[in-house]
């Protein structure tokens, strides 16, 4: 059972993720008692309880993010020292509420329909921030962590490619600049 994870057990958990039984589950699992069990079942009530307990903090953080100005590079992620929270913390908190199920593991989270509702809501929140503060945007910054396409320490900015997201059949990548206007995607809120 993995309900009270410690810092050291999180490292062990990261190593063991490849052993989860996703390939044997024929449906989405949320917050199972045991993510390694062939017959794991969702504990939706427990996940809902966890989300409910986070709501006051999430609501307060979101209110501050939308009413107290911070430059985009601070409000968008954890790496740049924002003082009132950031969108990444709001985003990650909901994924983590689902524990060892599909939403808790990056490689398979998009298989859970909740993922799509969650990300649509994060897009909406981001659009509200853009509407409120239209003059702040992505700035060049050294990357604190590397990814499969960006080296740690690389300088990334508004014109950097957002791999692996292709914007056309020629292989051109979306950038923060080309994706800045969310209405170009046909969205309305």
Identify the residue ranges that each predicted region occupies.
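C-terminal accessory segments of proteins
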Residues: 1-189
């Amino acid at each position: 059972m993995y309900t009270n994870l410690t810092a050291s057990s999180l490292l062990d958990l990261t190593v063991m993720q490849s052993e989860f039984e996703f390939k044997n589950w024929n449906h989405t699992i949320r917050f199972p008692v045991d993510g390694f069990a062939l017959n794991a079942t969702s504990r939706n009530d427990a996940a809902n309880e966890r989300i409910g307990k986070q709501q006051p903090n999430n609501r307060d953080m979101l209110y501050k993010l939308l009413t107290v100005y911070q430059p985009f590079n601070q409000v968008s992620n954890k790496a740049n020292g924002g003082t009132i929270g950031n969108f990444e913390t709001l985003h990650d908190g909901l994924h983590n509420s689902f524990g060892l199920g599909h939403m808790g593991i990056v490689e398979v989270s998009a298989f859970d329909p909740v993922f799509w509702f969650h990300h649509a809501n994060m897009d909406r929140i981001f659009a509200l921030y853009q509407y409120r503060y239209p003059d702040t945007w992505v700035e060049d910054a050294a990357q604190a962590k590397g990814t499969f396409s960006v080296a740690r320490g690389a300088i990334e900015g508004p014109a950097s490619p957002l791999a692996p997201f292709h914007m056309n059949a020629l292989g051109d990548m979306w950038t923060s600049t080309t994706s800045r206007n969310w209405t170009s995607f046909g969205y309305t809120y």
